[in-house]
């Protein structure tokens, strides 16, 4: 094979955005090695510049004529592009909110950013991976980096405890996922590429076998852990409470987006012959997530734990689009993750600012905050109201698109349950807003009474201000501009071959008469 044919098969230009992130990662480490601690003043901006360059590269790859690279191991189609963009953008905002937080914790900023970029790289590769080995390696890159980030503040015993819990539960979920993947490898006759696995299973007529069902259950369990879906959510509240706040901000968006990208690609490509079965399982997960997440959040006294259960509920809402299995369903998933990026990170930026100035994240301590810090109060109020689905904010339109897609697909009772639990969520969101805004001066918490003077010129506070303002504007404007954003999401689905081919494959599989399988 000559070099030209090899280059054509590799098509390495498809992973140019990931290449930019790798170069940025190496640049961060080299600059820190040369300059030491003095590099912390601007090393965050170097990482942000690299991530923005990667996002620009993704933009120029939109609707590429040949998205397949590395002989089918990675597909840079529009679906992967938009998920990779969400993950990279979440890393940008995370770095903005991390600079002051990490420096104040007494740990090295360069190493933190390097691990965060590694996690971003893993998430981006997961979003386009179409081969079992690449999926597993990318998923482990994201997972191991997340474990390290969770325990990064080594002097904090809560961070160490959170990292240990995350590692133990994460390792268990990885083992379960890997066993499910190994069953797929065996059932397909030794195939590792997703399309080849689906064809091998259909050819061997083992799609309805016990082995295929076990593989499906184990794969869904691994994905459920990554998206924080109940009952695979046990790690979420403790990790959210103990881990550094910028880390959980990234996990709540970047890791969740990677999990949903993997779910769409793996389930629609490999399991079209059991579509009704995996939709039934995800329906159960969605019901549990929406009910448990929203009901348990009512009793929380910590902002971080409240948002942990909120993220579980949000995963339940997003799963409605996945269960619908239509173009509108997938597009509404993508749109909701886009706006969730802005409104959730806006909320976490406010929590970081408040904790840096007061040292607490208890909900009761926010009482009367409006009179001391109007900008922070505005940002947190807008983000919480948007998460609750209050019009005309972005979260309202995100839920409208999800519920409408579910209704069109005949998921009537699931949509009604989503509406009811969404109303429940408004209570615990508005409770915080009311506490910040409505309280009289004499009802201020002791922490707010002693609130320090607001000084944005302190080291590391300016990036936090930029992150807060940008996410606040995006959360407010995304509702008004919901139609262009939904059109973008819809185009990403319409231009993705695997989602369009799934309809044809499902029809063909349903036409095959059921026979007793030869294998498991």
UniProtKB/Swiss-Prot annotation:
Protein family (similarity comment): Belongs to the complex I subunit 2 family.
Q: Which keywords does this Swiss-Prot/TrEMBL entry list?
A: Membrane, NAD, NADP, Plastoquinone, Quinone, Thylakoid, Translocase, Transmembrane, Transmembrane helix, Transport
Function text? NDH-1 shuttles electrons from an unknown electron donor, via FMN and iron-sulfur (Fe-S) centers, to quinones in the respiratory and/or the photosynthetic chain. The immediate electron acceptor for the enzyme in this species is believed to be plastoquinone. Couples the redox reaction to proton translocation, and thus conserves the redox energy in a proton gradient. Cyanobacterial NDH-1 also plays a role in inorganic carbon-concentration.
Reaction(s) catalysed (UniProt annotation): a plastoquinone + NADH + (n+1) H(+)(in) = a plastoquinol + NAD(+) + n H(+)(out); a plastoquinone + NADPH + (n+1) H(+)(in) = a plastoquinol + NADP(+) + n H(+)(out)
**Subunit field text:** NDH-1 can be composed of about 15 different subunits; different subcomplexes with different compositions have been identified which probably have different functions.
Give the principal location in a single coarse category: membrane
User: InterPro entries, from UniProt?
Assistant: NADH-Q_OxRdtase_suN/2, ND/Mrp_TM, Ndh2_N
- NCBIfam families named among the record's database cross-references: NDH_I_N, PRK02504.1
The terms under GO molecular function for this entry are: NADH dehydrogenase (ubiquinone) activity; quinone binding
**What are the record's GO terms for cellular component?**
plasma membrane-derived thylakoid membrane
Q: Which GO terms describe its biological process?
A: ATP synthesis coupled electron transport; photosynthesis, light reaction
Q: What is its EC number?
A: 7.1.1.-
Q: Where are the transmembrane segments?
A: 15-35, 42-62, 79-99, 106-126, 132-152, 167-187, 210-230, 244-264, 280-300, 306-326, 334-354, 378-398, 400-420, 466-486
Provide the membrane topology annotation: Multi-pass membrane protein
Q: Where does the secretion signal sit in this chain?
A: none
Q: Can you say what this protein is called?
A: NAD(P)H-quinone oxidoreductase subunit 2
Localization (cell): Cellular thylakoid membrane
Query: Do you know which HAMAP family this protein is assigned to?
Result: NDH1_NuoN_1
The enzyme's main class, written as a single word, is translocase
Question: What is an example of a Pfam family matching this protein?
Answer: Proton_antipo_M
Instruction: Output the PANTHER family linked to this UniProt entry.
Output: NADH DEHYDROGENASE (PTHR22773)
